[in-house]
């Protein structure tokens, strides 16, 4: 699977890892889209056994980005990460009365693509100006909508309110 990205990237693969792909995906979902340093911190404290091989692959992809492509490790983000199914080793567990159960020892291929994306502080000033302009346009149109949205109360509600006030005034006046 080849993916083209607009940012410079690096890839790392771990093949035939003795972890079920389903269990690896559970760990992978924790780190997808995060920075490499955050992902490694999360995986360091994750209790799942699959977190160790996933962390190794992410660290390898970061090292590839730094050494092969000359990318800054601080700007690396885990852009794409997935676990495909590898070959399954079949074993036999003897059971009672001559039976045998099949055990499937599943393997997975873990692939990580890290991208060097600029942090929010390093974005171009032009794009931030454009965002501010859009925000001011939205703010300018918002009050105009509010003024047109105010409506008069419904006739039925207005007549009920008037009748209640007249009843209370009559009750007060009649008791004097």
Curated annotation (Swiss-Prot):
Subunit and interaction comment: Part of the 50S ribosomal subunit.
Bias type Basic and acidic residues, positions: 159-176
Role, per record: This protein binds specifically to 23S rRNA; its binding is stimulated by other ribosomal proteins, e.g. L4, L17, and L20. It is important during the early stages of 50S assembly. It makes multiple contacts with different domains of the 23S rRNA in the assembled 50S subunit and ribosome.
Coiled coil ranges: none
Organism classification: Bacteria, Bacillati, Actinomycetota, Actinomycetes, Mycobacteriales
GO cellular component: cytosolic large ribosomal subunit
Any one Gene Ontology BP term: translation
Residue span of region Disordered: 113-176
Low complexity: bias regions: 136-152
Family the UniProt entry places it in: Belongs to the universal ribosomal protein uL22 family.
InterPro entries associated with the record: Ribosomal_uL22, Ribosomal_uL22_bac/chlpt-type, Ribosomal_uL22_bac/org-type, Ribosomal_uL22_CS, Ribosomal_uL22_sf
Keywords: Ribonucleoprotein, Ribosomal protein, RNA-binding, rRNA-binding
Name used for this protein in its record: Large ribosomal subunit protein uL22
Pfam families with a match to the protein in the record: Ribosomal_L22
Keyword Translocase: no
